[in-house]
Amino acid sequence: MKQYPGYTLVKREDCPEQHGTLTVLTHDVSGAAVLLVENNDDNKAFGIGFGTFPSDDTGVFHILEHSVLAGSEKYPVKSPFLQLLKSSMASFLNAMTFPDKTVYPFATPNETDFKNLMDVYLNAVFCPLAMVDKGVFEQEGWHRDEDGTVSGVVYNEMQGALATPDAQLQNALSRAMFPDTAYGFVSGGDPASIPALTYEKYVRVYRRHYSADNCCITLYGKMDMAEKLAFLDEQYLSRMPKSASRPRLTVQDEQVGAKRNIPYYTEKPEPDEAQCALAWYTGAFSDRERQLGVEILLDALLGTNQAPLKAALLEEKLGADIDVGFDDSTLQPTLELVLRGATEESAGKFAAAVRKAVDGILEKGIPEELLMASLNSTEFASLERPGSIPDGVLDAINASAGWLHTGDPALLLHTNALFASLREKLEQGWFNELLRELFAPAPVEIIQVPTLPRKEEEGRAARTDGKLVLDHPLTAADLGEGKKQTPGSKELLAGAELLHHPSAGNTYLYLYYDLGGMAPEDMSCLHLLTDVMDELDTEKHTAQELNTLRNTWLGSSGAWMDCWTGRQEGRPCHAKLIVGMSMLERSLEKAVELGSEWLYETKFSGPQAEAAMERVASQQKLLMEQKFLREGHAFAAMRAAAHFSVESALSERCNGVSYYHYLCELLEKADWTALGKKMEELWKSVLKKNALTVSLHGSDAALDTLKKLLPGSAFAAEKRGEAKPYTEELTAPVNEAFIIDGGVNYDVLVWPMERRLERKVLARVMSYEYLWHNIREVGGAYGTGMVTQNDGTEYLYTYRDPHLKESYETFAKGPAELADRDYTGKDMNEFIVGAAAKLDTPRKPREEAASTDCKYFCGITDEMTAAERKSLCSVDAAALKAEAADLSARMEKGVRVVFGSKEAVEAAKELFDRVETL
């Protein structure tokens, strides 16, 4: 068995879930835990996680997370992390604070980049200049401005983060569940407490927790592990002897039946916006079978509106929606149920309703087919690992959790045996007993009631502005030629356009129904329909029965709308209603069968359908109100871009403020019979167009199977209809402000600009050379940047910004400042590498499938991509300065949209043509 000098082998084992082997090591001198995940994934990853346990609400570990990335002994520049963002090929580059740990992970497909990033990260966490430079603490944590107001990046971020009713409810619940341990504190920091943190305590906390024997290091992917381990040993770990004792978490005595009422202060308190959260403990972290069983059980009982427990609770009509939360990453995992859209009176009845519903389910027993469906879909998701976060980053986070709570970094990476065991227990009544045990204790209960706001009460080693000097800086030569599309096939079969993209692994089937020619005023209704579809009965099954079958046979399935601006002449907008299904290849026939029933046999009328429409509309309205507070910049950008782009105009109708207005109008009219008729009419018109494209991402054998299935399926037609561009008349530009609760602002400026890939270089320079310093470091906003979009729009934005008018003034000065700067060849190389590398970010199979289909509809060829890439890589300083000089005039034609506080909007009301309170 292979040995590594300087390390003691703990264990080495095969891991089919990771397609390779796991090796757990302990570093001899420092005591650091190390996990090696060796497989053939080219998207290599690194992560280092520390056990960080807050003892107050000052957010010290969140501030440290920001601070250590602000300069180190080897890299003594103010923002090495920022400079990495500008020039790295990383597919993931971040740091994150959890309630009990802080993790610093990255992923990159480039070997040289990996070495650079690993050294910068290690030097940052072990040798930060923040320990001798109080200015970092003041910038990232908190300080007082000349007028006495408190500011700071984390302080401002948390003002926005904790402004939402959900965040306040969650924090109150954590305090009630864990009154005596670290989990009861706000790890991100409460703005009311952050100014109590002194620099001296901040330094002490760092020295206590950022030690090598209090960390877990993960190396993942296809790489020379011996080389990386030797670097770790020689450059860092061998210089760090073990500390006297590691900090440890304490176990909370379980709180049973604790109750508390809390207010949520808002300018528009509504009687039906109360919430109630109930929480229970789910057992030991180390009992992974039990925790996986809880996940499966919650999916079966609460995963959809028709699931037994959720359906029973919704029938009580105590509120508009019920959410379920489950966190099995902490020392004492918990589950919670949250009733939303309730009155104060109905919120008080929620706990009794849950008890009654659980007892009813236990009396009948949980249907085995329902449990099997949830087990299957959960297992598929655990193997597929959907989403954009690289697998290696997920492994690094999971390794830190496993090491922290059990000493075994590999614990969470093994799941096959757990699923096999639970399959055996499914028929033994194990899940019924688990349900009984989970809900037996009285829950911790928090009721939140909206209330009008109260009246305010009357209370170093130098870092340079220089460039980051890496041992092996990347150049344009490191970029390679870019990934080419795998050749596929296209044919007309059974009245449908059939695309095949050869791929291994899971099978992905996408059905694209063309929406060109649809009336713009109908698109909001059609979008709502895609959400309602999961809730409707068919001619053969109830909605719950069909959902159970879909979960049994498919990894995932759903319907949604999307649109893209094509590269064809005239830049048409291609709008599609998409039905997507993922599965094991052997389930392809079942996918066609279930998809046919779901799409062609749905019932839109009757009490069941009308109740589903009302329920989903209410739930979607609540969800949007929550998102306005968290993602205001995205809604603002969509709203403003709708004046310049058909793609954005359609997106705004289906996902923006216009869609929110549509939902409010529906709920006010409450004519669900009429809505059902409208939905059925729209659905039939989409299907009758017969402009269907079927895209299969899978093996040749899967293609042969699909060719046999399509002609006899409901998708078949005599001939294929014509696909058309989606069009609508754009509205005249309007500067708008939308008032939200929260005390922070999301400021956006959007302008039209013909799409050119070279503009991505300018966007990176604007984002990281100008906005980062002036908006984030000086202005105190949590985020900012410039974005170029494929639909022919560009925009500047701020995120959780304490300022409004000042930020627009800063925006306006940017073009001239960038045009006046001098850029060296090294500068241009960094900008180009950073911009071009994003074109090659590794994608997971599901993402790759969606991207391939999008390119097909938009007419994007490998030749186009190569030409654009060449153009981007040839941008020189003169071209960049010319683009910057031209930007000012374009920005003057832009539209301002803000989601912000009442005070900030009123102070800058001359900037807006229209103001609305959401």
PLM ranges: what are they?
Residues 58-70, 523, 527-531:
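Active-site recognition of the HExxH zinc-binding catalytic motif
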Residues 37-40, 47-49, 155, 159, ...:
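His/Glu-based metal-binding/catalytic segments typifying zinc-dependent metallopeptidases
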Residues 203-235, 651-656, 675-709, 892:
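Non-catalytic, conformational "gating/processing" segments within enzyme and secreted inhibitor domains
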